[in-house]
Amino acid sequence: QSIGHEDEPDPEPTEFKKISKEVIEKTVAKIDAKLSGNEKASSKAKAKLRYIKNNFVANLEKYEQQEAILGERNSYSKTDKEATFMRMKEDHMQNGQLKPAYNTQISTENQIIVHYTIHQNPTDTKTLKPHLEDFEQTFGKETLQELEEITADAGYGSEENYDYLEQKELTAYVKYNTFDKEQDKNYQKKHKPFSKENLYYNQDEDCYVCPMGQKMHKTHQSKRTTEAGYQQSLSHYQAKNCEGCPLRGQCFKAKGNRSIERNQNLERHKQRTRELLLSETGIQKRKQRTAD
């Protein structure tokens, strides 16, 4: 094994190709033929070839088995292969513990458990859709539609989840990640006065207005895929003449004119969610959720 580590670092590959058992065996056979017919071949080269023969195929099979167990996760426990390493809540010493675990999702109604699912993904955002799909499969489509409303905390407030709940015709009393901050009386003071959230957006003209009162027109659209594989549509806006602006140092420090992006669909969901959560029914549901 030491022979295999003595060589100089390999150069960066120009391209990455899938390696299979057959490819390794074919390559080894070619090298073996070259070395066998070469009297000047060094013993070191032959030792390396033996190392490849004895280890590469076996290691590849081991790695393929590990990848199959891993699936779409980034870790798994050797003692419980279905468990994923997750960051636990802080202990009494304020240390975050990384341990193999499962993410359990529980649906309740007036403190009565009506459904539960167990997930390998530590992120709550990615569990809402499969949890409700399992509920629908267990109890039927009509029962899911009878729910009419879903209440959840900010851990579930993603564009994908809002779209899914809208598709299922379920009213979403589901916080987005900045909802609680927006209710803080000092939120605007704490927030940077030149941040995107504090810029005025003109919906009729589809443009932003910068702190100097100049319009930031839309320049183009783009697509972005989230970690969960969900495709988002983004609108991009750009200011003009930032170089001579007296507020530039406070507003924008990078070179060129300031650019910002807006997710129209997500902003639509957030506006609707904000109205729901601040309504009398929404306030009551938020109180009930903490009790449940």
Please name every model-derived segment.
Residues 1-292:
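Anion-binding and metal-coordination hotspots
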